[in-house]
């Protein structure tokens, strides 16, 4: 069981040229590095709520990565709201981070999918089947 969460050195929030607020880095991040781990502290948000609808992630019965590896479909059982910077990252069709959910630890983990320079905004593709933006 995790006893602490990772936030990469230099990761911070500021105004974005893309949309509202965004998550940026003031230090280099290498491909494969964990950018941030966000805790999901409570049970999933019921599917009939309208609260924070634009910031929620779909809560699966199996992680997206595991489903892909096993060749099975992901079933969705509700929504979650990751704490930390999890709901602040902006969208890009050319992302520099990706994410997956560790169901046993109740953590969303964001990972660099390419080398990221200091000063860049950290972006992921909202078109993932697990994001409800």
Regions found by a protein language model. Give the residues of each.
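Conserved catalytic SET/PR domain of SAM-dependent protein methyltransferases, capturing the structural core
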Residues: 1-133
């Amino acid at each position: 069981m995790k006893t602490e969460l990772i936030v990469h050195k230099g990761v911070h929030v500021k105004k974005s040229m893309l949309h509202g607020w965004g998550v940026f880095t003031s230090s280099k991040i290498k491909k494969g590095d964990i950018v941030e781990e966000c805790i999901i502290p409570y049970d999933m948000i019921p599917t009939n709520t309208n609260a924070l609808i634009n910031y929620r992630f779909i809560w699966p019965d199996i992680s997206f990565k595991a489903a892909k590896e096993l060749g099975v479909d992901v079933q969705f059982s509700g929504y979650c709201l990751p704490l930390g910077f999890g709901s602040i990252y902006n969208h890009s069709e050319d992302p520099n981070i990706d994410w997956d959910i560790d169901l046993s630890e109740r953590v969303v983990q964001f990972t660099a999918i390419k080398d990221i320079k200091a000063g860049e905004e950290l972006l992921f593709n909202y078109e993932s089947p697990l994001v409800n933006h």
